[in-house]
Amino acid sequence: MRTMLKVQISAEAGNRAIKDGSLPEIIRKTLEAVQAEAAYFTAVDGKRTMFAVFDLKASSDIPRIAEPLFMGLNAAVEFIPCMNAEELKTGLAALG
């Protein structure tokens, strides 16, 4: 299922991860693990934020993806089902 991964890192945890060099490595490993089709980085509500879109093959993959973010960055992590324009078109057509 196409899924948007939202990762938010507090300023304190992000600063610590930048200083110790772990932030780029955790982000790299996460993007490799999910094989993201797209990833964007911004600030939302004063927190470093990443949005990555990927195919979540099984719900049992969630701990493998989320735990390094929880443990390494004290991040808030959300998995949000999403669709592209073509998938929306297909879904709306099924309504009749």
Q: Can you say where each PLM-predicted feature lies in the sequence?
A:
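Conserved, structured core segments of small domains
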Residues: 1-96
